From Swiss-Prot:
Keywords: NAD, Transferase. It comes from the Bacteria. It comes from Agrobacterium fabrum (strain C58 / ATCC 33970). Pfam families: PTS_2-RNA. GO terms for biological process: tRNA splicing, via endonucleolytic cleavage and ligation. Removes the 2'-phosphate from RNA via an intermediate in which the phosphate is ADP-ribosylated by NAD followed by a presumed transesterification to release the RNA and generate ADP-ribose 1''-2''-cyclic phosphate (APPR>P). May function as an ADP-ribosylase. InterPro entries: Ptrans_KptA/Tpt1 (IPR002745), RNA_2'-PTrans_C (IPR042081), RNA_2'-PTrans_KptA (IPR022928), RNA_2'-PTrans_N (IPR042080). Coiled coil: none annotated. This is Probable RNA 2'-phosphotransferase. GO terms for molecular function: NAD+ poly-ADP-ribosyltransferase activity; tRNA 2'-phosphotransferase activity. Its EC number is 2.7.1.-. Belongs to the KptA/TPT1 family.
Length: 186
């Protein structure tokens, strides 16, 4: 898999389809043939085999192909407005969010907000959250009381790639994990 191709697809399908003249539908889908043509016209060589390889080999399953293989979209992480069409689902009692310790103070004061994305991303396990936090510096894992949030009327969605999504997490539902190491996974 080409990392450059994966980054290009993430940029175009999550954040800037207009950068190559691509149009996403309301659920974030793009026509594969149109994507390939516009990628090549913009100077990014891409064929169908290469595209399918990136989709198949992405360890984080960032992209989803439609059942007929004619459309593609990012599984989650959009900054452009899309409705992934996922129904709200009941989450597990706890979810996890990984971040860097330097971001901890404002998070504990204001809660988790989506920032430039449409929704907050949460993990079902501590190990994944820890890996996410390590990308940004010294990691810390936050435990989200998802069960109580759900009971209080907050909605959760499960993306195609297993990432949990919600609009925001108020600080009152957050606890700092006493041990942010992977071996304490729940």
């Amino acid at each position: 898999m080409s990392t450059a191709t994966s980054k290009f697809l993430s940029y175009v399908l999550r954040h800037a389809p207009e950068s190559i003249g691509l149009v996403l539908d309301s659920q974030g889908w793009a026509d594969v043939a149109d994507l390939l043509a516009k990628a090549n016209a913009s100077g990014t060589p891409l064929d169908e085999a290469g595209l399918r390889a990136v989709v198949a080999e992405s360890d984080k399953k960032r992209f989803t192909l439609s059942e007929d293989g004619r459309r593609i979209r990012a599984a989650q992480g959009h900054s452009v407005k899309v409705d992934l069409g996922q129904p709200p689902v009941e989450p597990p009692p706890q979810l996890f969010h990984g971040t860097a310790t330097r971001f901890l103070e404002p998070i504990l004061r204001e809660g988790l907000r989506p920032g430039e994305r449409q929704q907050v991303h949460l993990s079902a396990d501590r190990t994944t959250a820890l890996a996410v936090g390590q990308r940004h510096g010294k990691p810390v894992v936050l435990i989200v009381d998802a069960g109580q949030m759900f009971a209080d009327g907050c909605r959760f969605y499960l993306a195609d790639n297993g990432v949990w999504l919600t609009d925001a997490v108020p600080f009152s539902y957050l606890t700092v994990s006493a041990d942010s190491s992977a071996e304490n996974d729940r």
